[in-house]
């Protein structure tokens, strides 16, 4: 096992973990970190993280069928993922990707798909019901003195049932969380961050992206297109608070 001095970002299964524009997260990181090494782990590859310690592991949204494939592909490396999570290695799962981390996915017909069991929650897939909203939340980052506001969109077929001990990714001021009955959105365990927010997340959230870059050791890296990104961010902080905004998506 090796630890890299250079920033290495592993993007898992980009050939299908790219739904709803979620591949824009990796695209934006490339723009922010032109000198970093990006490793795209595809379906037939042994993950880089199996023998190395990447600076960041990124997995984005995918279809229900590809969730099943992803669980099968990652299952042999489950204990390695536990080791990396416990060591505080940064990981970001966005869109529907967090659903592979739970204990199981309950399908519309009542059948169950066992998941990786890295986090204590159950996913209930309710196709054809669709849940959508806009979100403004406060990032779960207790080490910071000032709150980081996170914005994004939610478009999903699922509602999550979380165990009592889980910590959220953020606590929503606007929009629903893991399900319609809670404002707690996503999960955080050490530096594993899992969120259903899309947009994509990183180009929509300069303050969170700054936080993530600092977390992976890139404190001096500038945010790409910062003026435009911040203007968009500030506009969403205003418009997402308008009554009825969630009904438009």
Descriptions of predicted regions:
Residues 64-65, 98-100, 159-161, 201-203:
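Glycine-rich nucleotide phosphate-binding loop and flanking beta-alpha elements
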Residues 6, 53-54, 87-89, 111-114, ...:
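Short coil/turn connectors at secondary-structure junctions
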Residues 179-216:
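A glycine-centered loop/beta-turn motif at secondary-structure junctions
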Residues 56-60, 92, 194-196:
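Structural motif
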Residues 63-141:
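Cysteine-nucleophile active-site neighborhood
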Residues 1-86, 203-249:
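N-terminal beta1-alpha1 cap of cysteine-dependent amidohydrolase-like domains
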Residues 9, 95, 198:
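Residue-level signal for inorganic ion chemistry
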Residues 109-185:
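Pocket-forming structural segment of enzyme catalytic cores
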